[in-house]
Design a protein with these regions (language model features):
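Alpha/beta-hydrolase superfamily serine-hydrolase fold, recognizing
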Residues: 1-277
Length: 277
């Protein structure tokens, strides 16, 4: 069993690589022989914007505690609609497992962290690791799968259809348009929804999950997240929901006391999951 101490303070280096042609991965590498646990990081941006640097505040802090963090770019809408980026993240999960030794990491410890729409994407890949629409990209000379040890979800869009209805009510034309640009139809929003997967009773993987969200998040209503957490638990999953009073969407991407507290919770949750066989 790997030893991970969330109170570690380790020097890190940053490496820029590619995990498939034209798609970059930034690896935050702790110094030392390891073996270290590892995380795939999936950024947000309404499935359309931003890149692998978005979650740098959290990624660096996690890496400094002794976790290899691989923050990935992926294909984005509107040129690459659903489920293209889920397939890329599925591949990235397999790639990190297959390359774990290169980063002094243990492939059996690989988890996922995702923020906003990235929380949706990493959740779908983890809940449906063998789905043919997600797992079709070949990874030569590897038999690794996309199952994940645990998930750290930061203000995640785990219910895209419910969020779409919400932004219609609030008149958020930008998110309406970008959601339509990625999914195309409301049927696709429901099919590719972690929340709807649970509501349908679809058989799925349920890795232990921590959700962090601010109560002032106007991007996805907290009650929807609470309903997801309840459904996840009802389906037999281990889930913790930590709400941050008065904090907005994306609050953890800005250095400060609340992002520090969020990262501390993530480290604690990771340590708990990694201590289990």
């Amino acid at each position: 069993m790997i030893k991970y101490d969330p109170d570690n303070r380790i020097e890190i280096t940053v490496k820029e690589l590619e995990y498939q042609d034209g798609l970059a991965v930034r690896v935050y590498q702790p110094a030392g022989a390891g073996p270290f646990p590892a995380l795939v990081d999936v950024h947000g941006g309404v499935w359309t914007n931003a890149d692998r640097t978005q979650n740098e505040v959290m990624d660096r802090a996690l890496a400094e505690s002794g976790i290899v963090v691989a923050a990935v770019d992926f294909r984005q809408a509107p040129d690459n609609p659903y489920p293209a980026q889920v397939a890329d993240v599925n591949l990235a999960s397999r790639w990190l497992k297959s390359r774990a030794a290169d980063f002094n990491a243990d492939p059996n410890t690989v988890g996922g962290i995702g923020s906003s729409s990235g929380g949706h994407t990493i959740s779908l890949s983890a809940m449906r690791p063998y789905h043919p629409d997600y797992s079709y990209i070949d990874l030569p000379d590897s038999d690794a799968d996309a199952t994940l040890k645990y998930l750290l979800l930061c203000w995640p869009i785990i219910a895209p259809y419910e969020r779409y209805k919400y932004v219609q009510e609030t008149g958020n034309d930008r998110i309406i348009g970008l959601s339509e640009g990625y999914f195309g139809t409301t049927d696709a929003m429901k099919e590719g929804s972690p929340f709807q997967i649970l509501k349908r009773g679809e058989k799925s993987a349920l890795p232990p999950t921590l959700i962090v969200q601010g109560t002032a998040d106007t991007n996805l209503p907290v009650p929807v997240t609470e309903r997801f957490a309840a459904a996840f638990q009802e389906a037999g999953g281990d889930i913790e929901l930590e709400l941050f009073p008065g904090m907005p969407h994306l609050f953890g991407n800005t250095a400060g006391p609340e992002s520090d507290r969020a990262v501390a919770l993530m480290k604690k949750f990771a340590a708990k999951c990694l201590s289990q066989a």
